């Protein structure tokens, strides 16, 4: 592990993730978790241990179960484990992706807070045992951390989001030595990142991705795809049950008829 990107989600972590790939690195991001059932389960276990006191806290090589094959890690839920990751990977450099608290909150309201307000997530997770049964508990727990235990979709959680943002950034700045830390905003582009990580600056433009509209659109697409999958499987099950009942009735009627 060479780089810990400890900024919160919606601070340019996706753009930096793509940029690191273009530099030849192998970064890890929530994108790598979202469709990996085992990783979703591991991170949820780690979060329950840290925030709920359930089970043994993750430390040291425990994180290698998820991060062992990568040389950089970013985004939630990894960025919640500041002390643990600093202890597990003491030689890693730290990039703190930044933006103003109010612009971060506005971005969150237009993306993840909107997505978590889709209240049928819970119902979907009961029927979609292949994906949503793992994704929803993790996503919900992530959002509750940033809402400081409040219902993350409610307007009353707004002050808590801002408090968490301030506490998180204060903690990272306090724990990481300045010579090991780069505070970076996506508008700064390649130069600070490449200088900090000892890479030549690419000639291509720095990638700016994951707009608010794009984030919600991606979630909505996945959300309805999972619902369609549930409905299709339900229809298949109903059809199979109907076929079975019909078959039993047919053979039973033949058997009764032949005995007369």
UniProtKB/Swiss-Prot annotation:
Pfam families xrefs: Sulfotransfer_4
Q: What is the protein's species of origin?
A: Aspergillus versicolor
Give the matching InterPro entries.
P-loop_NTPase, Sulfotransfer_4
The encoding gene: avaM
Q: Which PANTHER family match?
A: P-LOOP CONTAINING NUCLEOSIDE TRIPHOSPHATE HYDROLASE PROTEIN, P-LOOP CONTAINING NUCLEOTIDE TRIPHOSPHATE HYDROLASE
Question: Does the keyword Cell division feature in the UniProt annotation?
Answer: no
Question: What's the name of the protein?
Answer: Ava biosynthesis cluster protein M
Q: In which pathway does it act?
A: Secondary metabolite biosynthesis
Which keywords accompany this UniProt record? Signal
SUPFAM superfamilies in the record: P-loop containing nucleoside triphosphate hydrolases (SSF52540)
Its taxonomic path starts at: Eukaryota, Fungi, Dikarya, Ascomycota, Pezizomycotina
Where is the signal peptide, in residue numbers?
1-15
Family per similarity comment: Belongs to the cytochrome P450 family.
Function summary: Part of the cluster that mediates the biosynthesis of a highly modified cyclo-arginine-tryptophan dipeptide (cRW). The first step of the pathway is perfornmed by the arginine-containing cyclodipeptide synthase (RCPDS) avaA that acts as the scaffold-generating enzyme and is responsible for formation of the cyclo-Arg-Trp (cRW) diketopiperazine. AvaB then acts as a multifunctional flavoenzyme that is responsible for generating the cyclo-Arg-formylkynurenine DKP, which can be deformylated by avaC. AvaB then further catalyzes an additional N-oxidation followed by cyclization and dehydration.
């Amino acid at each position: 592990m060479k780089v810990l990107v400890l900024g919160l989600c919606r601070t340019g972590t996706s753009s930096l993730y793509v940029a690191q790939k273009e530099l030849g690195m192998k970064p890890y991001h929530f994108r790598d978790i979202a469709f990996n059932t085992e990783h979703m389960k591991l991170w949820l276990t780690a979060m329950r241990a840290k925030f709920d006191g359930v089970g043994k806290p993750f430390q040291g090589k425990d994180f290698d179960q998820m991060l062992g094959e990568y040389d950089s890690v970013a985004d939630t839920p990894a960025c919640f484990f500041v002390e643990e990751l600093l202890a597990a990977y003491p030689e890693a450099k730290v990039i703190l992706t930044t933006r103003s608290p109010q612009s971060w909150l506005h971005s969150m309201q237009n993306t993840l807070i909107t997505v978590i307000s889709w209240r049928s997530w819970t119902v979907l997770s009961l029927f979609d045992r292949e994906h949503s049964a793992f994704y929803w508990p993790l996503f919900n727990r992530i959002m509750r951390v940033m809402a400081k235990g409040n219902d993350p979709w409610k307007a009353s959680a707004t002050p808590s989001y801002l408090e968490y943002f301030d506490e998180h950034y204060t903690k990272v700045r306090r724990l990481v030595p300045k010579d090991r830390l780069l505070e970076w905003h996506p508008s700064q582009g390649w130069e600070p990142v490449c200088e900090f990580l000892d890479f030549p600056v690419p000639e291509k433009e720095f990638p700016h991705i994951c707009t608010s509209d794009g984030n919600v659109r991606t979630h909505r697409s996945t959300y309805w795809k999972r619902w369609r999958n549930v409905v299709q499987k339900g229809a298949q099950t109903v059809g199979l049950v109907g076929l079975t009942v019909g078959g039993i009735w047919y053979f039973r009627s033949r058997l009764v008829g032949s005995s007369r």
